[in-house]
A protein has these predicted regions:
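Non-globular, low-confidence helical/coil segments that flank catalytic cores
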Residues: 3-194
């Protein structure tokens, strides 16, 4: 199993090391560059201890998995670990899921300017539903039908009302891990969206 580690931040390191403990990870994909928060060494050490190869992403890469593909986009932001993470487009047939990580609206704009993103069926809302992510420009460009928000109890107010309203105005079905628990998405292979 390959794993994509979208960005190197303290609040994400334990998740990666936990996955390495539980899953047989062949290759770990990481954003190239130094990390501001300092966890890169811990991730590299954990990958080595579990026998996982590490590949740094510097250009768009497409990985085929049977009837599905992952398109991994390199960092497009300039400052801060949130802006220098990987983005991932998971595709199966005519269905697409986009994960932008914790990037803000300015970096989402750069992502849209740099890569040709399709209309998507599902979006993992950026930065746990922060008001600074999941911009209207991104929603207008990729037109998601479903939004998933990975969030737990926090002191930041995530997800924010602004983000929830943007998603509702877009017509998205909204699913939140804090309210709904683990979210499973599946598509009927016979079904076609477009």
């Amino acid at each position: 199993l390959g794993d994509v580690y979208k960005r190197q931040d303290k609040d994400h390191v334990s998740g990666v090391t936990g996955l390495l403990d539980r899953l047989d990870v062949d290759t770990l994909l990481l954003p190239e560059g130094e990390d501001d928060a300092g966890p890169q060494e811990a991730v590299l050490s954990a990958a080595g201890a579990h026998g996982a190869a590490v590949r740094f992403i510097t250009a768009e890469e497409r990985l085929d998995f049977g009837r599905g593909t992952l398109t991994v986009y390199p960092p497009v932001g300039d400052a801060g670990d949130n802006e220098r993470g990987l983005s991932v487009l998971a595709s199966a047939g005519e269905n697409d899921l986009l994960i932008t990580g914790d990037m803000d609206a300015a970096t989402e704009k750069k992502l849209l300017e740099t890569f040709d993103l399709p209309d998507i069926e599902a979006l993992v809302a950026g930065h746990h539903g922060s008001k600074y992510a999941t911009s209207q420009a991104l929603l207008d460009a990729v037109r998601p039908e479903t939004a998933c928000i990975s969030v737990g109890s926090n002191s930041y107010g995530h997800p924010t009302e602004e983000t929830l309203l943007r998603l509702a105005r877009q017509g998205c079905g909204i699913y939140r891990t804090d309210l709904h628990g683990t979210i499973h998405l599946s598509w009927n292979q016979e079904e076609s969206h477009g």
